[in-house]
């Protein structure tokens, strides 16, 4: 178990087909204690919808809550939610040495359709909450003398906005792109405290949201002919959390399977 004994807060664990679920499952299999977070009202608003069984089914599929798995429902649009989430994780399992920020607010607004309210909400969930999570994580890591133990890890997520335009999803593109840009800055802020910060761009990933037409169209731009899987994204995260990745910080890992955007 390569990640035996670690304690991770993983955000965005709300659907069994999602990347967050795959990350939580992988970390549990690798020996990590996982405090998982989700917010199903956002899924309810989206075309894919929330899982029928809700978060109870999600936690059951991960083995059920107990000594190594806990779950919290929190709206990260609320300014005090990130710190409260870290506090709850610490109260349950002690020092959190691993933070995986996987949650996101999706937003399909082009330039003509976007609104100030949607821009503010995407900023609050995707950027502000991420920064406040990292801030709270670093504070509790320092308070628990985490640097002396070594191995602090933060992993953020982006979606390739630094590689190509996304003009039909401007609020989402702006805020997820910001996380990719913040990775280097946060890595510099935390490297002296014994914490690495990296970002994962998982490429087109089959989480059940794409139509058959879109899946086929994008699939033609992927050398394998098929989209990446959530388990493959989780494997990249596990790699960045391991001891062998101790010297890797400030990087964005483009795990896109050779995605040829010019074909798509």
Where would I find each of the regions flagged by the language model?
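A conserved structural motif in NAD(P)-dependent oxidoreductases
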Residues: 222-233
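Short, small/polar-rich loop/turn modules that mediate ligand/substrate recognition or access, typified
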Residues: 191, 196, 248-250
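Short-chain dehydrogenase/reductase
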Residues: 1-93, 106-109
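Catalytic loop of short-chain dehydrogenase/reductase
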Residues: 12, 146-178, 183-192, 204
